[in-house]
């Protein structure tokens, strides 16, 4: 962008701002949106959804895109069964979190114990909508049109520094309060985007999705 075009762009933006009265520029309160999402989450015993996950890391080149089906059962069971790359799994069985990714690290599975208290557990959605007023500062971004309705977009920043991310922007469906998209800025430098479709709430989840038995010959690495 040249200096002249940059100045022209700033002048145009200033003209737009001056055309609206201050009341039109007042930031919308994000908390009613988050309260709606939190209330909805409390009614969910189990959930499943198709997911597309994109992880971008400028240090390693092109973004990595994966797909599959996500499962959740409160309070501490969570799973991601990947169809691309096929065979990869993430399983939280209530006691352990299993990370099995033969597509990148064949011959091993990483196992870590789930803390019994003090966290939401390995819960992709719940970490953002359980007690959000206690855990985050929030800013309303804008509304967005979805294929099946409208979503409100809110950016969250953790109040404490012990989270593995510095910010998360979430899309909350206006009609039912379900989270449909998450863009997470991780402290590792990665940006992770997860988009959920075909959400099914309280329709039951097969118990096998929350169990993991290491295949023969696979080494268990405890962390």
Q: Where do the protein language model's features map onto the residues?
A:
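Bacterial N-terminal signal peptides that target proteins for export
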Residues: 1-10, 23
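Bacterial N-terminal signal peptides
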Residues: 9-19
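N-terminal leader/targeting segments and the immediate start of mature chains
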Residues: 13, 23-63, 77, 214-223
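Extracytoplasmic
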Residues: 44-46, 65-67, 73-75, 85, ...
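Short hydrophobic/aromatic-rich beta-strand segments that constitute the beta-sheet cores
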Residues: 51, 78-81, 97-100, 156, ...
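An acidic-aromatic
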Residues: 69-121, 192-195
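Gly/Pro-enriched, hydrophobic low-complexity segments
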Residues: 108-110, 124, 133-223
């Amino acid at each position: 962008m040249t200096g002249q075009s940059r100045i022209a762009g700033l002048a145009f933006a200033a003209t737009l701002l001056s055309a609206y009265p201050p009341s039109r520029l007042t930031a919308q309160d994000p908390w009613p949106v988050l309260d709606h999402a939190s209330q909805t989450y409390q009614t969910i015993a189990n959930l499943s959804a198709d997911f597309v996950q994109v992880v971008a890391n400028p240090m390693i080149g092109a973004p990595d895109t994966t797909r599959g089906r996500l499962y959740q059962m409160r309070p501490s069971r969570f799973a991601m069964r990947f169809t691309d790359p096929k065979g990869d799994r993430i399983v939280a069985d209530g006691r352990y979190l299993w990370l099995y990714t033969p597509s990148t690290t064949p011959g091993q599975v990483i196992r870590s114990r789930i803390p019994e208290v003090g966290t939401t557990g390995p819960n992709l959605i719940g970490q953002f909508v359980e007690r959000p007023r206690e855990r985050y500062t929030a800013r309303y971004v804008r509304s967005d049109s979805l294929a099946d309705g409208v979503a409100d977009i809110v950016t969250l920043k953790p109040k404490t520094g012990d989270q593995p991310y510095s910010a998360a922007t979430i899309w909350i469906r206006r009609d039912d309060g379900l989270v449909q998209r998450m863009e997470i800025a991780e402290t590792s430098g990665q940006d992770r985007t997860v988009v959920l479709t075909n959400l099914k709430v309280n329709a039951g989840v097969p118990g096998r999705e929350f169990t993991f038995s290491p295949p023969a010959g696979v080494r268990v690495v405890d962390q």
